[in-house]
From Swiss-Prot:
Pathway in which the depicted protein is active: Amino-acid biosynthesis; L-histidine biosynthesis; L-histidine from 5-phospho-alpha-D-ribose 1-diphosphate: step 1/9
Primary location: cytoplasm
EC number: 2.4.2.17
Name of the molecule in the record: ATP phosphoribosyltransferase
Keywords associated with the record: Amino-acid biosynthesis, ATP-binding, Cytoplasm, Glycosyltransferase, Histidine biosynthesis, Magnesium, Metal-binding, Nucleotide-binding, Transferase
Classification via HAMAP family: HisG_Long
Catalytic activity entry: 1-(5-phospho-beta-D-ribosyl)-ATP + diphosphate = 5-phospho-alpha-D-ribose 1-diphosphate + ATP
CDD domains in the record: PBP2_HisGL3
Purpose: Catalyzes the condensation of ATP and 5-phosphoribose 1-diphosphate to form N'-(5'-phosphoribosyl)-ATP (PR-ATP). Has a crucial role in the pathway because the rate of histidine biosynthesis seems to be controlled primarily by regulation of HisG enzymatic activity.
C-alpha cells in the first residue's frame, strides 16, 4: 500500500488559493487547516504537503516529494534537474505568464541592462539574476531581498529584479522597467525515480490531464440553442467550436438543437449575430473541464 501513495507538494502563499481552486475544478477537494501544512485530499492515493513554491523544486529533485507544483522561475533559480509533467498556465491573478523584470526609479539615469555595471541590485531571484547578468558580461552586486523589494531603490539598491503580473505595484512605487529577464508559468514537476515508477507516472499523468482540462475550461463555456432548418447553415457558419458543433434534430423536424463549446469572451458578440441568423432558446453554462 505504501507504494500506492503519491507525495505531492502544493505551493503555499500567493499561488495557494488559485491552486486549490484549480484542483477542486479538476475534481479534487482539498481541505487545509490553518494549523497544519498537511492538507486533507479526498483521494487516499495522494498525500499532500504545503510548502513555499521556492522549496518545492529542491524537495522534488531529492525525492522527498514525488511531485509538486511550482513556478518555472523557481526551477531555474534552484538550478535543479527535474522532469516537467505539465505546464499549467496560471498565476495568482490570472491565466497568463508572470514576468521577472529589472526595474529602476523613474528618474534613474539607468536606461539599459548595460548601465547596471557595478550597480547594486536587490531581488529574491539571486541565482538566476547573477547568471543572466554574467551572460551579458555585466558585473554587479546582487543581493537577496527578504520582501518589499519595490521600496529598496534608490537608497538601498540602484535597481531591482522583481516579479510582476500586472505592473501596478511597480508603477505605484514609481519604478520603470528596463528589461524583462524571464517569463514564468506554473509547472507540475517530478523526479527521475518517481517517473520510473509506472503507477506513479500514470497517476501524475492523470492528475495533469485533469488540471489542464480544468484550466482550459476557465476560458470556455457551453452554449445550446434551437435553430430552424432553413437557418442552420447560416448559424453554423458563425460558430467556432472546439470541434464540430453537436447537432440533433428535434421532435419538430423543422428544428435542430445545436450545442458548442466556445471561448467565453466571444459570447457577448456572438449571441446577437446568432439570434439575427435565426437561432433562439439560448442556454449558456459553465464548464469544469475541457479535455480535447
Amino acid at each position: 500500500m505504501k507504494d500506492k501513495v503519491l507525495k505531492l507538494g502544493l505551493p503555499k502563499g500567493s499561488l495557494q488559493e488559485t491552486t486549490l481552486k484549480l484542483f477542486k475544478k479538476a475534481g479534487y477537494n482539498i481541505h487545509v487547516s490553518h494549523r497544519s501544512y498537511y492538507p486533507v485530499i479526498d483521494d487516499e492515493e495522494i498525500s499532500g504537503m504545503l510548502l513555499r513554491a521556492q522549496e518545492v523544486p529542491v524537495y522534488v529533485e531529492k525525492g522527498y516529494l514525488d511531485c509538486g507544483l511550482t513556478g518555472y522561475d523557481w526551477i531555474l533559480e534552484q538550478n535543479v534537474d527535474v522532469i516537467e509533467v505539465a505546464e499549467l498556465r496560471y498565476a495568482k491573478e490570472g491565466f497568463r505568464p508572470v514576468k521577472w523584470v529589472i526595474a529602476v526609479p523613474e528618474d534613474s539615469p539607468i536606461k539599459t541592462v548595460e548601465d547596471l555595471q557595478g550597480k547594486r541590485i536587490a531581488t529574491e531571484l539571486v541565482g538566476y539574476t547573477k547568471r543572466y547578468l554574467k551572460s551579458k558580461g555585466i558585473k554587479a552586486e546582487v543581493y537577496f531581498s527578504w520582501g518589499a523589494t519595490e521600496v529598496k531603490p534608490p537608497y538601498l539598491a540602484d535597481a531591482i529584479v522583481d516579479l510582476t503580473e500586472t505592473g501596478t505595484s511597480l508603477k505605484a512605487n514609481k519604478l520603470r522597467v528596463i528589461e524583462t529577464i524571464l517569463e514564468s508559468t506554473t509547472r507540475f514537476i517530478t523526479n527521475k525515480n518517481a517517473w520510473k515508477n509506472s503507477w506513479k507516472k500514470k497517476k501524475m499523468q492523470d492528475i495533469a490531464m485533469l488540471l489542464q482540462g480544468a484550466l482550459l475550461a476557465e476560458e470556455k463555456v457551453g452554449l445550446k440553442m434551437n435553430v430552424p432548418k432553413d437557418s442552420l447553415k447560416k448559424v453554423l457558419c458563425l460558430l467556432n467550436s472546439l470541434h464540430s458543433p453537436t447537432i440533433s434534430q428535434l421532435y419538430d423536424e423543422e428544428w435542430y438543437a445545436v450545442e458548442v463549446i466556445i471561448n467565453e469572451k466571444k459570447v457577448r458578440e456572438l449571441l446577437p449575430k446568432l439570434k439575427d441568423a435565426g437561432a433562439s432558446g439560448f442556454v449558456e453554462y459553465p464548464l469544469n473541464k475541457v479535455i480535447p
